[in-house]
Amino acid sequence: MERTFAIIKPDAVERNVTGKVLAMIEEGGFKIVGMKKIRLSKCQAEGFYYVHKERPFFGDLCAFMSRGPVIALVLEKENAIADWRALMGATNPANAEAGTIRKALGVSIEENTVHGSDSPESASYEIPYFFNQLELV
């Protein structure tokens, strides 16, 4: 079994669509092995998104991710990373395929409802950023 990391972003929490996202995750065959609701500080968001530090959108991204609560998740299934990326859909909801979370619930490129690890290396950094082993069942 493979594990991946996911975040339900502040825009989705604000719009009360967390339950819809969780339903789509479970319908997609994922097992939720870790879940917590947290509010990132700007510093924590900067640490999490450090790989984008030199990108022009870094400041706006960190401000957005720290503006309200998020739901951090660890998902498990065979091919979890690729399957989660497929279920999320394209970054821009306008370009996402029907049946994906971003097509159904995304508002814009920034307010696109969810985040997901893009590789095993990313997952191995992102999961322990939010969870210790005792929190994963």
From Swiss-Prot:
Residue intervals passing through the bilayer: none
Keywords: ATP-binding, Cytoplasm, Kinase, Magnesium, Metal-binding, Nucleotide metabolism, Nucleotide-binding, Phosphoprotein, Transferase
PROSITE patterns named in the record: NDPK, NDPK_LIKE
An annotated Gene Ontology molecular function: metal ion binding
InterPro entries: NDK-like_dom, NDK-like_dom_sf, Nucleoside_diP_kinase, Nucleoside_diP_kinase_AS
Residues annotated to bind ATP: K9, F57, R85, T91, R102, N112
GO cellular component, one term: cytoplasm
EC number of this enzyme: 2.7.4.6
Cofactor(s) recorded in Swiss-Prot or TrEMBL: Mg(2+)
Reported function: Major role in the synthesis of nucleoside triphosphates other than ATP. The ATP gamma phosphate is transferred to the NDP beta phosphate via a ping-pong mechanism, using a phosphorylated active-site intermediate.
Family membership noted in the UniProt record: Belongs to the NDK family.
Subunit structure: Homotetramer.
Protein name: Nucleoside diphosphate kinase
Upper classification of the organism: Bacteria, Pseudomonadati, Thermodesulfobacteriota, Desulfuromonadia, Geobacterales
